[in-house]
């Protein structure tokens, strides 16, 4: 069984998103079948600008392979986040080309990561599981109140 886990953050990156993604992968390893193979696609650690964390671009350990996509340094403004996600999206699409999974899992505080995972699942005829950590409907009003320029 092959599973793709798509997460913008993954250890050694810091924060709740990285920890949650790692918990999902750990649970899958513990409870999954003996033929389980998990492909994690994430970014290089980039959550906090003041903390430099090293991570290899590619790791392969036991049943898990991790591909980390390098993104340019960015701030946390909306424009920078959109730019980072667009670059992440293009890199993910290139990386998953001609690959197949039984299940695609996305853990995301961004609806765009979930939509990217849904696109991959449809394209590969895989089952999709979404773990959305942010209630978009609760936060959209706060986002729209901020000035963009």
Can you name each region flagged by the protein language model?
Residues 1-65:
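N-terminal subdomain of nucleotide-sugar transferases
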Residues 8, 71-80, 98-99, 126-149:
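Acceptor-binding helix/loop patch of EC 2.4 sugar-transfer enzymes
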Residues 42, 108, 132:
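A cross-domain feature marking catalytic cores of carbohydrate-active enzymes
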């Amino acid at each position: 069984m092959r599973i793709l886990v798509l997460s913008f953050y993954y250890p050694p990156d810091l924060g709740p998103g990285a920890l949650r993604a790692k918990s999902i992968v750990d649970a899958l390893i513990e409870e999954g079948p003996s033929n389980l193979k998990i492909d994690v696609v994430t970014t290089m650690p980039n959550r906090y600008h003041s903390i430099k964390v090293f991570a290899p671009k590619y790791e392969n350990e036991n049943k898990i392979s991790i591909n980390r996509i390098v993104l340019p340094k960015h701030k946390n403004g909306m424009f920078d986040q959109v730019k980072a996600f667009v670059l992440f999206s293009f890199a993910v699409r290139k990386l998953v080309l001609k690959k197949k999974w039984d299940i695609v899992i996305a853990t995301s505080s961004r609806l765009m990561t979930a939509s990217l995972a849904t696109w991959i699942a449809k394209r590969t005829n895989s089952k999709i599981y979404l773990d959305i950590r942010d209630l978009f409907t609760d936060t959209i009003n706060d986002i729209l109140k901020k000035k963009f320029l």
